[in-house]
């Protein structure tokens, strides 16, 4: 593992998407994103279409905490639904982000 890489895993518990991170240096941490927030992020991406976005632009647009948006975007990126676009931005890899996001969320909830 390179110096700045992390071990990142996702789980679903009690209606929340949980992102657990174990950095190579520092303390492990976790952040949560309620399912309704994940849905709002996914719908916002669908509405943006081909337009790129950042954590902060989605957080501001949807009036959500940036940590919840960061969890949602990390999950969508890990599942191949969005990709990194330039240094701090993202772009959808396909149409139907909400449908794919909910499919992946429920699969994770059922299968771990």
Kindly give the residue locations of the regions a language model identified.
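Short amphipathic alpha-helical interaction segments
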Residues: 63-78
